[in-house]
Curated annotation (Swiss-Prot):
PANTHER family: TRANSCRIPTIONAL REGULATOR MRAZ. This is Transcriptional regulator MraZ. It comes from the Bacteria. Pfam families: MraZ. HAMAP family: MraZ. Belongs to the MraZ family. Its main location: cytoplasm. GO terms for cellular component: cytoplasm; nucleoid. Keywords: Cytoplasm, DNA-binding, Repeat, Transcription, Transcription regulation. It is found in: Cytoplasm, Nucleoid. GO terms for molecular function: DNA-binding transcription factor activity; transcription cis-regulatory region binding. It comes from Dictyoglomus thermophilum (strain ATCC 35947 / DSM 3960 / H-6-12).
Amino acid sequence: MFVGEYYHSLDEKGRLIIPNDFRQLLGETFYLTRGFERCLNIYTITDWNNFSQIISSFSPTDNLMRKLCRFWFSGSIQVTTDKLGRILIPSFLIEYAELSKEVVIIGAGKHIEIWAKEKWEEFNKEENILENMNEINSKVAELWKK
């Protein structure tokens, strides 16, 4: 599982150091894709393939799933770390996530998220998890029963 919060800098060429703890779990090659909250997500090859199989299995007549497939596949690239543990983030993903020099890399369980520092701080203010704790606890309790 990916856990933790790391503050790093995106260099002028769009390169970002992936924390060593994360690299050990990811391996050298993995997938970088658009996230659902204007962040970027990193998945192991196995998890990316599993999710890709799931969304590809829906009927091609399902308009919503076609939109998800377009979003997912067009916004995904396979990346490999260099000798310094950096990845090169393409400009279209930098623009999507509105990344600037300061970024936050967080562990989110089965994947990693890359956020613009300002957006991460804003998200944490807006999405006060403590205000939703009763609803969250109910969902977790349901999962524990299974």
